[in-house]
Amino acid sequence: MGRRGTRDTGPDGAGEPEGVPGTELLADADRSDSWFLVVEGTPQSHVDLSDPSYLDFSYMRRIAHAADLVAPAGEPIDALHLGAGALTLARYVAHTRPGSRQRAVDVDAPLVEMVRRRLPWDRRAQLRVGIGDAREWIGARHADSADLVVSDVFAGARTPARLTSVEFYGEMARVLRPGGLLAVNIGDGHSLEHTRAQAATARAVLPHVALTAAPAILRGRRFGNLVLVAGHRPLPSEDLGRRAHRDPEMARLLEGGDLDRFVSGRAPVHDADAVDSPAPPDDVF
């Protein structure tokens, strides 16, 4: 998590929300009106209800870099979010790009209702949240309908296998507009075999792919989050790299030859051979 949370206070009381077993809302001890959402022991989201532009988790800032660069600053966009959590990025987009049309989906109905009730978002936001399977939901969306697609889906601390394949990436690419960006959150560590295969998978579907993460994670020295950014057209790589370098947790951007060497001949993943993302070590959180 990186910083402290406490169960002492919260919106309507902190701790385990009624009717949502395994889920905790923890007040941020260092920041007022801010909360950590923890699911099955895994810190899933952080939200600042007073300032949605504040992003505590470094991987979320890396996804936000893509959201910032997909269109001119302040211009409304159409965004799809696979995995709702506490809707941190959707709140960010609504705040930084007023008038954006956003849809999000999550399979966990009690969690979505708890977030709606306990961590309400700005009513002016054009944000609709549905309940359902991310892959089925994205398959029902119209082609060329989104400027930004974010895949941040975890069952506990692992991404389900069916959300890691060429077939799934193909559905996300189908709904992405020509100038749009796809951002995928990946949890991995040590050999980074899962991430290498995911980069190969994204490349099998979209011609332009980059990967960003902290150097220690890219070297396999610790388990953490890596973010894939992909699109039909060349990426805003210079700006992405500059923002990654200037982030409070500095990151590197891999693309082109650097990404070739990282992937190092790994084959794309298909439904028939897909597996869940690796589980983090017990002491990560």
PLM segments and residue spans:
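SAM/dcSAM-binding transferase cores
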Residues: G2-A29, Q44-S50, R219-F285
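The AdoMet/dcAdoMet-binding core of the Class I SAM-like
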Residues: E16-E18, R31, S50-R174, P178, ...
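N-terminal glycine-rich anion-binding loops that anchor highly charged ligand groups
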Residues: D30-V39
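Short, basic/glycine-rich phosphate-binding loops at helix/coil junctions
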Residues: V38-H46, V149, L181
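Short "lid" loop at the C-terminus of a central beta-strand within the Rossmann-like core
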Residues: A155-G156, G187-S191, A216-L218
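Alpha-helical subdomain
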Residues: L163, D188-T195, T201, P268-D283
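Conserved Class I S-adenosyl-L-methionine
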Residues: Y169-G170, H194-P215
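Conserved beta-strand signature within the Rossmann-like core of class I S-adenosyl-L-methionine
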Residues: G179-I186
